[in-house]
Amino acid sequence: ASDCLVSVRGDSVLIVLGDSPTTHVPASKHSGREATAEQLVDQAAMQVAGSLGGSAVVGPVVPGISHAGRSLRSALAGLRALPGWAEAPNPVHADDLLPERLLAGDELAGEQILHLVHAPLHEMGDPFESTVATYLALGGSLEATARNLFVHANTVRYRLGRVSEQVGWDATNARDGLMLHMAIIVGRLAVSREA
């Protein structure tokens, strides 16, 4: 990072990293500047977490300084919600703590779940969203989901696989399933507020 701002807040160290457009970024397997910036932030977070000996929560990479406050708020909300996920890696991304943040009352988490998880799932269409919702509501049973939706179990597998590929969250994984379940609930609540 070409710019760095460090601040101490209570027993927390806040670090905001900045990058100029002319900074050399090494090639990576990920495409796009955001993926590369996220890799650099992850590397820095690993070093900071290791040297400080405490928990590290990484806010999302944002396009500019005008959005840095949002990233910082996400990271601070993640730090407050971190005790809710005992198995969280260190460092952990604030967006990976969205369910805990939402339960802790973080309104920004609700917006982010709608944008990052629910919107892509909803855009896939009702068969995919209802398959995920039914699968999670029935405790992860492929057969019960297939019976409930009047489709073959392979159709359920296919739909869940497509959701995993397109949305990035796998309903068959307990942690990802929690994220998807929260996204479906938040999406339903958003629709009911609009009605």
Residue ranges and their predicted role:
Residues 1-195:
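Cytosolic nucleotide-utilizing catalytic cores of signal-transduction proteins
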